[in-house]
Amino acid sequence: MASVRKRKMARSSVRKVTRRNRDKQRKVNIACNPIIEKNWDYNLTLAQNYKRLGLTAKLAPRAGGEEIDLSKVIQKSVPICSAFEDYDSESDVEQEKRNNDDALEDGEYDPAKIPEGEARIQRDENGDVVKVVYGTMKTVDVDEDISELKQKLEQDKVKTEVVQELESYASRPVNRRVRYQSSREEEWLGRLYEKHGEDYNSMARDLKLNIYQQSVGDLKRRMKKWLKAHHIDERQ
């Protein structure tokens, strides 16, 4: 004979947690989109699947760490520099060479080759300033967040086949379904038309026929469709 505790547990609505039930809860059934369902890998997590398919799992910015792909980690050797090398100063020859690289064949400076925030001074034969050319070339900010840089790089990548299939699936022509009025709605609109004609303000104030208090605009749209279906000319 079972004890009082065992009998109470048998009658309880809370069942014992078993491994079999837990595995059923962990199984994910992807049925939202046929293209994603076809390319889904059940051995990967949601974030890993979205990244593999070229999609974004979360629209909000990251709040924590990100899984590192060890297959793409490149081990770089430590650069060895001379202790007497001067990083702060730059020779006039190198500066002149950089300025010549930014200049075109006719001596004019190309703003697209000059980094943003810098400028080049163009002088004439006498050394007088002729023009100041400001650079427009975008540079990478070292203080910028790494996540923002990764996001910019991911946006420049070529779209995956799954993304291309989803875009073509979303841009397919969709036939618009025509809504037809039911027999009860047609009967109700007919009674309103017999009583009020095309006076929609009176229809809206009729508490006996307009029991759901449809607005003037809603009644006008319904009545316009009803008049067209019954081949009745609408009063201008």
UniProtKB/Swiss-Prot annotation:
Disulphide-bonded residues: none
Subcellular location: Nucleus, Nucleolus
Record key words, sorted: Nucleus, Ribonucleoprotein, Ribosome biogenesis, rRNA processing
Entry GO terms, CC: nucleolus; preribosome, large subunit precursor
Parts forming coiled coils: none
Keyword Nucleus: yes
Biological role: Involved in the biogenesis of the 60S ribosomal subunit.
Subunit composition and interactions: Component of the pre-66S ribosomal particle.
Protein's name in the database: Nucleolar protein 16
Species per Swiss-Prot/TrEMBL record: Eremothecium gossypii (strain ATCC 10895 / CBS 109.51 / FGSC 9923 / NRRL Y-1056)
UniProt gene name: NOP16
